[in-house]
C-alpha cells in the first residue's frame, strides 16, 4: 500500500528479478501459472506473504478452476514494489491474458502501464485498492474503505459515550487511497474532523506490526494517557497492543482496526482488539476472475465500482452500531484458522 520511493538501482534489480520469475512461472516473487484453459486471466497482488493476498489468490484459483481457464499470478517482493507490478503487467500482456486483476502498490505510478494494457484490449480490474485516478482501471471490486473506517469510529464513539478521548491514529502512509479512506471514515464515525484536539498522535506504520509497535511507543512517550487507538490494519493493531502491554497500559486502551483476518478476529475474541471491520478478499478475486472470463467469452466489460461488503466484528456490541460476533467472524475470516 505504500508509494515509498526507492533508489533507481534497487528498482531495476527488482524489475529484472520479477521478469525472470514470471517468465519461469515460479520463484521468489510468487509468479506462477496454473490451469490448462485457452483463456488466460492474470492476478497481481502486492505481496505473496500477507494472508489477505494469499486468500485472494486462493479465491481466484478456485474460480479459474471452476471456469476452466488458466490463471497467471505474480506478486511484489514487498508492499510498495511498483517495479515488479509493472513488469508483471507487461509480461502478462505478452502472454496473451484477456484480463488482469491487480491490487496496486503505488496507485499513481502504475497507471501508465495499466493504460498501455487497456489500449491493447486487456480488461483491467483493481481489487481492494483503487488506482489514482480510480477510472484508470475498467472496474474496481473492493471494500468500501470509508465505511470500514466509519464503522469502527461509530463503535468507539458509542463505547466512550461522551467521555473525553485521547486518540492515536496508526496510519498507512501519505497519499495511499485505502489508508486515507479508512482514516477519514474513522474520524467521521467518531464525529470529529482533521486537527481535532482529541487526536494527540498520528504516525505512519506501512501496516507493519514492528513499525506500529515503534509508532505506539512514540505516541505513548508524547501522551502517556492515550485511551483510543485507531489502526490501519490488524498487524498494526497487534503492534500497538505489544507497545501498550510493555508499558502496562493494555487494560485501559480501546483498539479498533480493519481487516477481519483470522488472526485479527482471534484478537477480538481475546479482547486485544475491541472491534474490527471485516473485508472479503476471496469474494473480490472470484468476482474478478468471473468478470475476466465473461469479457474473454462475450466481450462484455465489467465497469464501475462493485462493493464486496464489510462487517463490524465484536463481542461487545454497542447500541446503534450494526455488528456480528466473533463466531461469525471466524467463519468468514481469511488466513490460518
In which residue ranges do the predicted regions lie?
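A residue-level marker of the well-folded mature domains of exported/periplasmic proteins
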Residues: 2-11, 18, 25-337
Amino acid at each position: 500500500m505504500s508509494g515509498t520511493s526507492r533508489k533507481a538501482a534497487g528498482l531495476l534489480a527488482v524489475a529484472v528479478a520479477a521478469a525472470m520469475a514470471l517468465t519461469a512461472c515460479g520463484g521468489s516473487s510468487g509468479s506462477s501459472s496454473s490451469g490448462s484453459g485457452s483463456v488466460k486471466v492474470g492476478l497481481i497482488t502486492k505481496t505473496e506473504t500477507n494472508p489477505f493476498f494469499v486468500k485472494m489468490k486462493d479465491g481466484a484459483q478456485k474460480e479459474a478452476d471452476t471456469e476452466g481457464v488458466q490463471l497467471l499470478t505474480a506478486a511484489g517482493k514487498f508492499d510498495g514494489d511498483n517495479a515488479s507490478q509493472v513488469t508483471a503487467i507487461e509480461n502478462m500482456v505478452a502472454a496473451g491474458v484477456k484480463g488482469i486483476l491487480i491490487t496496486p502498490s503505488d496507485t499513481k505510478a502504475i497507471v501508465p502501464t495499466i493504460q498501455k494494457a487497456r489500449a491493447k484490449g486487456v480488461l483491467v480490474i483493481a481489487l481492494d485498492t483503487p488506482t489514482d485516478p480510480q477510472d484508470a482501471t475498467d472496474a474496481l471490486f473492493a471494500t468500501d474503505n470509508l465505511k470500514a473506517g466509519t464503522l469502527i469510529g461509530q463503535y468507539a464513539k458509542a463505547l466512550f459515550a461522551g467521555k473525553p478521548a485521547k486518540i492515536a491514529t496508526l496510519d498507512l502512509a501519505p497519499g495511499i487511497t485505502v489508508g486515507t479512506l479508512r482514516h477519514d471514515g474513522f474520524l467521521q464515525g467518531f464525529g470529529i474532523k482533521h486537527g481535532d484536539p482529541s487526536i494527540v498522535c498520528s504516525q505512519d506504520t506501512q501496516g507493519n506490526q514492528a513499525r506500529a509497535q515503534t509508532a505506539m511507543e512514540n505516541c505513548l512517550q508524547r501522551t502517556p494517557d492515550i485511551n483510543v487507538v485507531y489502526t490501519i490494519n490488524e498487524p498494526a493493531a497487534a503492534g500497538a497492543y505489544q507497545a501498550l502491554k510493555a508499558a502496562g497500559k493494555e487494560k485501559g486502551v480501546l483498539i479498533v482496526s480493519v481487516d477481519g483476518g483470522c488472526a485479527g478476529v482471534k484478537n477480538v475474541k481475546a479482547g486485544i482488539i475491541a472491534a474490527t471491520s471485516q473485508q472479503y478478499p476471496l469474494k473480490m478475486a472470484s468476482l474478478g476472475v468471473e468478470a475476466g472470463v465473461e469479457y474473454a467469452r462475450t466481450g462484455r466489460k465489467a465497469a464501475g465500482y462493485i462493493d464486496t461488503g464489510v462487517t463490524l466484528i465484536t463481542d461487545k456490541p454497542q447500541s446503534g452500531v450494526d455488528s456480528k460476533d466473533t463466531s461469525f467472524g471466524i467463519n468468514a475470516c481469511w488466513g490460518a484458522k
